[in-house]
A protein has these predicted regions:
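Function-dense linear segments that define catalytic or interfacial modules
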Residues: 25-123, 135-139
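Active-site-proximal structural scaffolding
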Residues: 14-17, 26, 67-72, 98-101, ...
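Extended amphipathic alpha-helical segments enriched in small hydrophobics
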Residues: 127-146
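A general alpha-helix detector
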Residues: 20, 135-139, 155
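Internal maturation/activation junctions in enzymes
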Residues: 97-120, 145-186
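Single conserved hydrophobic/aromatic residue that forms the stacking wall/gate
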Residues: 1-12
Length: 186
């Protein structure tokens, strides 16, 4: 039988703690900081509840309650695989793959294993999916664009705007086919 160790407690002034957090963030990239008020202000589903937290990487923020544990089904498009021989985005190929990925992410909701009923309830009620990109720096290398340049920012805007538009379009088409999710109205 092991006795739990008593952890030493200490007091730290709020400014000192804030400086320590910011120093660590600057030096290591951790801890990640997310402000709940900003998340709730910008949430497209304010009508469904309050965002209390994010996932570990803070890439998603979803509503939680006693009946719901936030779940998100995430996927990425590998941008370098969507560049043609001249280094331009192949928009037809990108649209085909984004559309397929959105359908697959929606299918994951139906075939997923849920360890707790609150996760299943949340996933079926909101059907949350997220699509991002990966390989951005590889794409810049292929395009011979320096990472810290205005051209890199422009390419980020172009590629993410296309992926976002195509994903929203694919999701809309899927809703016409399968119906909207139950918490959509609001």
């Amino acid at each position: 039988h092991l006795r739990p160790r008593r952890q030493r407690q200490m007091c730290i002034r709020d400014r000192e703690l804030w400086r320590k957090i910011l120093s660590m963030l600057f030096e290591t990239g951790h801890p990640w900081i997310t402000f709940k008020d900003a998340c709730n202000l910008r949430s497209p589903q304010q009508h469904t509840g309050v965002i209390h937290s994010s996932n570990l990487c803070t890439e998603i923020t979803l509503n939680t309650s006693n009946d719901e544990i936030a779940v998100c089904n995430l996927g990425s498009i590998n941008i370098p695989n969507h560049l043609d021989a001249e280094g331009n985005l192949d928009k037809e190929k990108l649209e085909k793959n984004v559309t397929t990925a959105i359908r697959m992410l929606d299918n994951v909701i139906d075939i997923n294993y849920y360890a707790v009923p609150q996760a299943e309830n949340s996933n079926f009620k909101h059907r949350p999916i997220g699509m991002g990109i990966m390989g951005f720096q590889d794409a810049l290398y292929i395009k011979k664009i320096p990472y810290a340049s205005e051209a890199a920012v422009d390419f980020a805007d172009e590629s993410m705007e296309l992926v976002s538009y195509m994903a929203i379009n694919a999701s809309s088409d899927l809703a016409k086919e399968r119906g909207s999710y139950s918490s959509y109205e609001g």
